UniProtKB/Swiss-Prot annotation:
GO terms for cellular component: ribonuclease P complex. It holds the Pfam family Ribonuclease_P. Its EC number is 3.1.26.5. RNaseP catalyzes the removal of the 5'-leader sequence from pre-tRNA to produce the mature 5'-terminus. It can also cleave other RNA substrates such as 4.5S RNA. The protein component plays an auxiliary but essential role in vivo by binding to the 5'-leader sequence and broadening the substrate specificity of the ribozyme. Belongs to the RnpA family. HAMAP family: RNase_P (MF_00227). Disulfide bonds: none annotated. GO terms for biological process: tRNA 5'-leader removal. This is Ribonuclease P protein component. It catalyses: Endonucleolytic cleavage of RNA, removing 5'-extranucleotides from tRNA precursor. Keywords: Endonuclease, Hydrolase, Nuclease, RNA-binding, tRNA processing.
Amino acid sequence: MKQFAFPKYERLLKRSEFVQFTNARQRIHTAHFILLWTHTEDSTLKIGITVSRKVGNSVIRNRVKRLVREFYRLNKSRFVMAHYNIIAKKGAEQLDFQRLSRELANVLERLHK
């Protein structure tokens, strides 16, 4: 069961950690998400989730973040060791978990090509 955990050391929490993505050239766009990633020298896997107010009110934004966290938790082994920031675009609030999972799984497949 611990393999499906999402401990604090796997999260991007500080502003300075998110700022490293400002000039990230490594990005993939989909209809509802933007995935930014940077390889780091410490070879750790960390993820940050960004949902702006354009997506909806706080209840909706938190739901989108919960769904993305759940996708990460269940598919952690498919991520390469790097730091990721998943940004939700307007319209992501309309996705259910299956459609969100399909879209993010396609992103990971494109990432590994």
